[in-house]
Amino acid sequence: MAFSRLWRNNHLPFVGIMILLAAALCLMFYALLWKAGNLADLPSLRIGFYNFCLWKEDMGSLACYNFPELDVLGIPQVGLALARLGVYGALVLTVFVPLPLLLAQYNRDEGEWRLAVCFLAASSILLAGGLSLFLSFVWKWLRLSFLGPALPALCLAQLLLIFLLVATVRFPPRDKEDKNQWENC
């Protein structure tokens, strides 16, 4: 009985959406801030959104490259900047999703709900675009076995963002229901 009341009042889907949102945020914080965006972090290779270090045999250590050298290696400055903007912009927009969702749930305001949907859609597009753009530039130095836990975390966050977008569209806030339904007869 209590379970059906929670479902009918739209509380259970809302709690599920908020839990999934917290999980997506944790995964993005882990990959982009804790792991510093490094998709490959090995003793002989470090490739991330802000690090590009390859092993130099003659030096016997990692040599990190910046933009004049990165252009020679085939990584354009504008492309890398757009990839960074995409993934870190997705994190920033996702941070702002819970507040409009909370306000939409408790005020039953459709405008705030639409704002949360727009933030989720933009975050999903930015994360997918930034990650695919970055991987297209650095894939010739990466192998599947080189990848660390940051890439699966970002891919799982992308899946959660898509699922959140679908769930948020599927379960919009409902209008306030009258407590006394006998008066409507």
UniProtKB/Swiss-Prot annotation:
Q: Membrane-spanning residues where?
A: 14-34, 85-105, 115-135, 146-166
Q: Where in the cell is it found?
A: Membrane
The residues on the Extracellular side of the membrane are: 35-84, 136-145
Which ranges make up the Cytoplasmic topological domains here? 1-13, 106-114, 167-185
GO CC terms: membrane
Q: Which InterPro entries match?
A: TM140
Residues annotated as coiled-coil are: none
Q: Which UniProt keywords apply?
A: Membrane, Transmembrane, Transmembrane helix
Which Pfam families has this protein been placed in?
Answer: TM140
Q: How is this protein situated with respect to the membrane? A: Multi-pass membrane protein
Name of this protein: Transmembrane protein 140
State the organism of origin. Answer: Mus musculus
**Could you tell me the gene encoding this protein?**
Tmem140
